[in-house]
Amino acid sequence: LMFLDSDEILSQQNLKQLPTLLENEAVSAYRLKRVDYFHQKKLRFGETGNCSIIRLARSNAIRYQRVVHEIPIIAGQVENSHLEIRHYPHHNLNDFLNTVNNYAELEASYRFSEKYFYPKLKIILELLIYPNVKFLLNYFLKLGIADGFAGLAYAVLMSFHSLLVRVYLYEKYFLN
């Protein structure tokens, strides 16, 4: 079972190599390297710089947890492959902002519906700390700065996503 999101592309060359991977019946699933692009620039660093994601699995060995940003649960051995997926998630900053907002609201709704307990103090502390730490981690420690404007945009907007998740959680727990 090969599955890609609508904004992911597997090259013809990589597609031709899939049967070779499937020959090893001991492996239940494979992680493929995902390379993100923003403004036609390949992101080599930051949060998306070294991303491998399960995109090839035997249908009898996989199930999913969560509806949005689903997490594959694999029964059996998972290995890394050399295959690469190109990921074009955002056409421009406006598209990126809309996506960040939508996913933040979905994530907060998921956490709220799963009945995680979030005391007010925890949400406020995370609101103040987590987005800032995430920016520093992605932009400086993971070298997002080396990706230029695209790296800065990603670091800022993914930190903003972290902020929005907590703002939406605060609204759900304490303002409704």
Each language-model region and where it sits:
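Catalytic metal- and UDP-sugar-binding loop of GT-A-like glycosyltransferases, i.e.
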Residues: 4-6
